[in-house]
Structure formats: C-alpha cells, structure tokens
C-alpha cells in the first residue's frame, strides 16, 4: 500500500548563481515518520530547509506539503506546520511563563502542557528570562512554543544546537516519545549524527548534486558494510570496482565500504590475485556509515 506522504519534493533543481546545488532531487517523507537529513557542508541541506519553509523558490521542480506547493501554502496548511530554525525566540525580555501566556492568545488549540512538559524535562525554571538563557535553552523554549501549537509536521533545523550532552540525551528521548505518542511527522537536520541516530526512523543522505540514500535507517546501517584488511602493497586501486562504494587506505591498511557481503569482497581480492591478511568486518554506527559513504574529506 502506497504511504501517505506529508512532504514530497519532485525534481527539485536549484543553483546559486552558476553553481549547481542539486538537480532533479526527489524526497518523500511519510506520515508519522521521523526523517533525518544528513550531508556535508555545502551539500544542500540549508537550501532544502529554505525551500520547505517557503523562503526560497527552486529554479525548477516543486516541494509539496500536504499536497500544497510550499511557495503558496494556505493559512490552514501553515497552521499544521511547526518550524524550528536556529532556535530564535522573539521578546527576549519576557520570562518562560510570560512568553507562553503571550503566545497562547494567538492559537485556539494551544496545548499548554506540551510546552511545560518540555520545559520541566529540561529543568528550565518558569521565571527565567529568555535574555539570560544559553543558545541551547532558547532553542528549547522555541521548540516548546512550537509543540504547544500542536502542529502535525515539525521541521527542525539543527534541533540540538547548543545543548550539552546530558540535555541532548534528555531532549532526544522526550522528542521521540512525544512524536510517536502524538503521531507527528518530523523532518530534521543535525550536525551531531549520534543524536540523530537515536531519534530518527528514516535517513536521507545528500552529497553534492544528488541523494545517496533514502531508506529506513536500520536498513541502511544493516546493508552498508565496512571491511578492513591489509595488503602487501599500498598502491593497489580498488575504488573503480562496481562492488566498492568507497575505499580509504593509509599505507597498506584498507577500509573497503560496500553493499556487498564478505564472500563477494574476498572473491574480488582473490580474482585479482591480491594477497590480503587480517580481513575483518567492522561494526558501524550511523556516523561511521555516513563517513564511509561520503568520504572523510
């Protein structure tokens, strides 16, 4: 059965001046799923976020949210979307309690508990002024205000920016629990891949001009493998073989990244008459897999 897609980006092409960001990019985010967008700096993550929130019009193609073009969203559809962009909070002279009361007057379906549940979880005091908060605390107040609006779709750009490791773990556990319990759809980015791995259902990995992976994160980290081995020489090129997604080596130590299995990699080496030793499959986190797929540099 075809999933119900909340976000659909169809044949997106965009340039900055004459520089191609991506061409004919397609993205689908299914209802009720948490999707994480990963890519190196300059791969097009911010461009995608800006197209989704309507700040930027693609050169060609279109992005749809709930079936409407993001350049022309109706007021009803806009109310279904919560954006967190770098955690900016207006009215920083207010405290935590005052800003909640102020915002609640604009939203008829305001969920006060959603705001204070997050604030209490992160141990932010109700009387603390926004102006005295760290960047990470401000971002969480902004997110609390978004959750209280009860959107169906959350778009979170660098969602854990500025939080220390302990608070990040608290927030991630809370966010996953909240999204599943309330059946929310989430599209997010983060530079901290370990955080993303704990939170997401699906992964989208972009490299320059293209999508490398869009799949359930568990499927990707199960199928994509790293094998290490040592060779007698350090000048053997393996990158051009169809089985190789990426190959890194330092002197005679090789890291071979592939969607193939152990027997296929061993067969490749043996068919080329390459003597090898210390052949191992390495366990991989999402961060390891991302670096293996896109390269270290």
PLM feature spans:
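ABC transporter nucleotide-binding domain
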Residues: 170-259
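Helix-to-loop junction immediately C-terminal to a conserved catalytic motif
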Residues: 53
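Conserved structural motif at the start of ABC-family nucleotide-binding domains
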Residues: 7, 22-24, 78
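Conserved ABC transporter NBD signature motif
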Residues: 61-72, 76-77
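Catalytic Walker B motif of ABC-type/P-loop ATPase nucleotide-binding domains
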Residues: 154-158, 163
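C-terminal coupling/interaction segments
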Residues: 257-297
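ABC-family P-loop ATPase nucleotide-binding domains
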Residues: 85-141
